[in-house]
From Swiss-Prot:
Residues that coordinate or bind [4Fe-4S] cluster: 110, 230, 320
Protein name stated in the entry: Quinolinate synthase
Localization annotation: Cytoplasm
UniProt family annotation: Belongs to the quinolinate synthase family. Type 3 subfamily.
Residues in the signal sequence: none
Cofactor: [4Fe-4S] cluster
UniProt cofactor note: Binds 1 [4Fe-4S] cluster per subunit.
Keyword Acetylation annotated: no
Gene from which this protein is expressed: nadA
Pathway the protein takes part in: Cofactor biosynthesis; NAD(+) biosynthesis; quinolinate from iminoaspartate: step 1/1
Protein task: Catalyzes the condensation of iminoaspartate with dihydroxyacetone phosphate to form quinolinate.
Domain of life of the native organism: Bacteria
Amino acid sequence: MSILEKVQPIETMLPERYYTMSTEDMEKRVREIKEKMGETLFIPGHHYQKDEVVQFSDAAGDSLQLAQVAASNKEAKYIVFCGVHFMAETADMLTTDEQVVILPDMRAGCSMADMADIEQTERAWKELTKLFGDTMIPLTYVNSTAAIKAFCGRNGGATVTSSNAKQMVSWAFTQKERLVFLPDQHLGRNTAYDLGIPLDKMAVWDPHTDSLEYDGDIEEIQVILWKGHCSVHQNFTVKNIENVRKNHPDMNIIVHPECCYEVVAASDYAGSTKYIIDMIESAPSGSKWAIGTEMNLVNRIIQQHPDKEIVSLNPFMCPCLTMNRIDLPHLLWALETIERGEEINVISVDKQVTEEAVLALNRMLERV
């Protein structure tokens, strides 16, 4: 068991009966429990979740929106978080001690968040301090563990989302000369470049070799990027863009900034999940779009805008596998367990970690 979590030892695997229930019966039971529990139950759902789950969300949004919703909700006793592990951790840290945060399936993790563990990060900070002294401030994408957020908090740094990355990177440079950006190198690189920092003033820290990779003068380095990435957005390529340009020259290409620099540079637009949703929403009827982000969201956008021609930038994309672990059976299981007065898959972050991580989260939330 992780030192950051205290999971109730009741039943950790989905009981067999949920595999045999019909969709109609499961949906009926979820509605019954939601109605019965009223405001004591709150279900936030990330945009990348399946439709079968999102339909029951009390709030749907990207990571920033859900962080803000979690921080403002004081009424619900139970928060059943339909997202991935780091999001549930964030919800637990921003809510009161009396509120219980539950993740329907504990296997719903994030490969990007796992690419930066606290031991690697502490070691990297020590080595980088030897090179650059007290000139660095850490920023972490919210797609990171509570321990990494806490590291940033106690070292004067903050969290960022894809919605506010430019704002937070700009703030970071008012604090220190250099920025260490974890764990997604692509969001960090794309954001810094948009703010006018050339690529040769960026370096990449490889946590597996404990080495700094750079092309320019080491004294000129302003941004140190952690060598991590999103496994979903890594699958969008310049070749995908070339194919769209060739076969559909009048199609707009919009991607998430977790895509690599080359893909973002070759696209027409790049922005957060909310940015993509809003852009398509406001686009004229008949417009054509190729979207480079998670497939559940792309399919939902397609369904919501039948008046527009919308495709995935990569025709062979699949949904985020860890997000997809949260499904209707796991949601119902979590709710029925609460109904019986029991608790499963409780996310409870260590108190000291919470205090330090909240410093980083609040430095972000007070600026957005």
